Curated annotation (Swiss-Prot):
Assembly notes: Efficient DNA binding requires dimerization with another bHLH protein.
Associated disorder: Cranial dysinnervation disorder, congenital, with absent corneal reflex and developmental delay: An autosomal recessive form of congenital cranial dysinnervation disorder. This term defines a heterogeneous group of neurodevelopmental disorders caused by a primary disturbance of innervation due to deficient, absent, or misguided cranial nerves.
Gene Ontology MF: a single term: protein homodimerization activity
GO-annotated biological processes: auditory behavior; axon development; cell fate commitment; cochlea development; cochlea morphogenesis; craniofacial suture morphogenesis; exit from mitosis; forebrain development
Organism (species): Homo sapiens (Human)
Location within or outside the cell: Nucleus
Protein name listed in UniProt: Neurogenin-1
Source domain of life: Eukaryota
UniProt-listed Gene3D superfamilies: Helix-loop-helix DNA-binding domain
Length: 237
């Protein structure tokens, strides 16, 4: 027993001496306290620093929403402006198209009036339609061209009429025309060159809209014999 007590006392003495030697070392609690003081002095802790961008992003979210709303407003304004611009463009194009069509019709009517002025005259209360005016002018020009062709060939008017007209029309012809009568010579050439007597003529009988019972159109500026004996003018009687 005394030996054991001596060993315990010696151990305690050694521990006290070693504790006095290790007094310069820090304990765990003191080490943690010093680390906390150093971290607080140097700045916020690492988790706080990591959370800083999240806070800034949260503060930037309202600004981003405002920018998005502003962009949507601008898009809506642009859409409204574009629709108004398209409407104005369509309206201006429609107005221009109407003006072009109106000018075209005015020019067409003026040209037809000029054509009617050079054709054989009609009564004041008679006015041909557009297609009738064109057909009549075509036949009139064709008869004049055939008259000039026969005049160049030197064929006598009566002989040409008898040779070119159908046989059933020959007994209805008047007597031989006078050489000094320009109107009768024109009538003989027109009768010889009638588009109704020539199958190759482009103006066929079915092209005319007149019936045999239609009213007779009078031509004050031309002789009556010429109008009644020229088959190309029969549809207009």
């Amino acid at each position: 027993m005394p030996a054991r007590l001596e060993t315990c006392i010696s151990d305690l003495d050694c521990a006290s001496s070693s504790g006095s030697d290790l007094s310069g070392f820090l304990t765990d609690e003191e080490d943690c306290a010093r680390l906390q003081q150093a971290a607080s002095a140097s700045g916020p802790p690492a988790p706080a620093r990591r959370g800083a961008p999240n806070i800034s992003r949260a503060s930037e979210v309202p600004g981003a929403q405002d920018d998005e709303q502003e962009r949507r407003r601008r898009r809506g304004r642009t859409r409204v402006r574009s629709e108004a611009l398209l409407h104005s463009l369509r309206r201006s194009r429609r107005v221009k198209a109407n003006d072009r069509e109106r000018n075209r019709m005015h020019n067409l009517n003026a040209a037809l009036d000029a054509l009617r002025s050079v054709l054989p005259s009609f009564p004041d209360d008679t006015k041909l339609t557009k297609i009738e005016t064109l057909r009549f002018a075509y036949n009139y020009i064709w008869a004049l061209a055939e008259t000039l062709r026969l005049a160049d060939q030197g064929l006598p008017g009566g002989g040409a009429r008898e040779r070119l007209l159908p046989p059933q029309c020959v007994p209805c012809l008047p007597g031989p025309p006078s050489p000094a009568s320009d109107a009768e010579s024109w009538g003989s050439g027109a009768a010889a060159a009638s588009p109704l007597s020539d199958p190759s003529s482009p103006a066929a009988s079915e092209d005319f809209t007149y019936r045999p019972g239609d009213p007779v159109f009078s031509f004050p500026s031309l002789p009556k014999d010429l109008l009644h004996t020229t088959p190309c003018f029969i549809p207009y009687h």
